[in-house]
Amino acid sequence: MTGPRPTTVFLVRHGLPTSGEHIDPPLSETGQAQAALLGAWLVHEQPVAVYASDYRRAWQTAAPLARLLGLEVQQRKGLREWASSRTHYVRPEDLAHTPEGRAFAEGRFEDFVPDHDRVALRATMVGELRGIGDRHPGQTVAVVSHGGALNTLLASAVGSERPFFFNPGYAAVSRMQVWPDGRLVVASVNETAHLAPQRLRAFLTNDKAATE
């Protein structure tokens, strides 16, 4: 007799967005290429559902994969990034000359994280993942969210109190198992093989043979 099987969740940070326009920017050209490469790679895992936050940079990242699978992207507010007082989106790398940008570059992530309700964000992200596990027992699912939100989730799973302990790449993938008893088990963090520079360059120059 086989025992209970976990739900396998591919956790994805959104692709590279534009910056400085408004609070909910779309993907940049590079971000669109990252999303396409992600979809071409992850489709072989045959997710039965594709979830994303309702911010454009997240659901646009999920869209190519969903298209290849013949699925709709299920948008969830609970997968949003942490709240911020900013009125427009700024990519971390565009803050290089600010104190918080220097903290980010030096790996002092605690000094980069904005003041927000960390307990609430952690509870929301853990609740979202457990809900996905309940809806898709023993199946495979893809989830596109945000760097801070994913850090919070992964930190909870490994028992870390730090709200931001690594810098996930754009369109990078981490793998998590959601067990029927609610346990969250991290299987991998920050996979980027599908985003090899030569593949990204080839996609941007329409050399499709080199992306295969």
Indicate where each model-derived feature is located:
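Active-site-proximal alpha-helix that buttresses catalytic centers in soluble enzyme cores
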Residues: 4-75
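Conserved histidine-centered catalytic loops in small-molecule metabolism enzymes
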Residues: 46-78, 99-103, 177-212
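Generic beta-sheet signal
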Residues: 9, 139-145
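Phosphate-handling substructures
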Residues: 26, 69-127, 187-188, 199-200, ...
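Short beta-strand scaffold positions
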Residues: 52-53, 123, 144-145
